Amino acid sequence: MDGMYNFHSAGDYSDKSVLMMSPESLMFPSDYQALLCSSAGENRVSDVFGSDELLSVAVSALSSEAASIAPEIRRNDDNVSLTVIKAKIACHPSYPRLLQAYIDCQKVGAPPEIACLLEEIQRESDVYKQEVVPSSCFGADPELDEFMETYCDILVKYKSDLARPFDEATCFLNKIEMQLRNLCTGVESARGVSEDGVISSDEELSGGDHEVAEDGRQRCEDRDLKDRLLRKFGSRISTLKLEFSKKKKKGKLPREARQALLDWWNLHYKWPYPTEGDKIALADATGLDQKQINNWFINQRKRHWKPSENMPFAMMDDSSGSFFTEE
């Protein structure tokens, strides 16, 4: 499990790491009723996810190597005091974070009422964290610090892995529900249901056949009219579609065409007046028409070019000419 999440636990805590993340540590639907009943106590944090359950899981992960946690809890007969281990974990500054990550895992896939209850328990845990000051501090036991930090991160990643299939399934079901709703709506519209959603037998016998025949005749007439119009104007419609597809947005030149015009501008900055031959070449290179090219150069010269004082006035743009906006 450590390798799966790219974590490396301390040597004294790694052997039993899989116990913390095993499926047996999560709640099943059969456990929800017990959770609802046990949540009536005054301290639901301790009753539901306190020393009894979460600490037992953590201690199980530590029991085989717990003798190396700190010298003061070693015994000559090599028997580990689980009570001392639980106390050290519960007093660690990272324990509230471990509890929160554990509750987040339990909330994945839980029914709404269970999820709400777990959120209340989590809020009570936040209040409990503010009232209780941990009796230990970081650095007092580096190996325990690393254990707590590692498994907090593992639980966060584990919760993400648990939530992913639930999120994908929820998205899929929502799409299916929307498709079914649209399908049912389309069927009801096609059948022409009444205001209360029920078609009376009188309507079916008297008006149903007439309406179906009328709709069928109307569809045939529409199809015939469409075929005649396509035969008569099909070529013209194709030509118009081609022209519309080639037409550029008004005042907005393609980026490649604008770059080609800028390249020509930079090369002829001293006299940026393209000849007719230059305009034809630019039109072939950019796909623009003569009017677009003329407008671009007029705007470019008005905005970014100032003729020298000794330049003949006749060679300049006519000051009364039209001003076109490119963008």
Swiss-Prot record:
It comes from Arabidopsis thaliana. It comes from the Eukaryota. May form heterodimeric complex with the TALE/BELL protein BLH9/PNY. Interacts with OFP2 and OFP4. Induction: Seems to be repressed by AS2 and AS1 but induced by STM, CUC1 and CUC2. SMART domains: ELK, HOX, KNOX1, KNOX2. GO terms for molecular function: DNA-binding transcription factor activity; DNA-binding transcription factor activity, RNA polymerase II-specific; transcription cis-regulatory region binding. Residues 224-244 form the ELK domain. Plays a role in meristem function. Contributes to the shoot apical meristem (SAM) maintenance and organ separation by controlling boundary establishment in embryo in a CUC1, CUC2 and STM-dependent manner. Involved in maintaining cells in an undifferentiated, meristematic state. Probably binds to the DNA sequence 5'-TGAC-3'. Pfam families: ELK, Homeobox_KN, KNOX1, KNOX2. This is Homeobox protein knotted-1-like 6. One of its GO terms (biological process) is meristem maintenance. Belongs to the TALE/KNOX homeobox family. Expressed predominantly in shoot apices of seedlings, and, to a lower extent, in rosette leaves. One of its GO terms (cellular component) is nucleus.
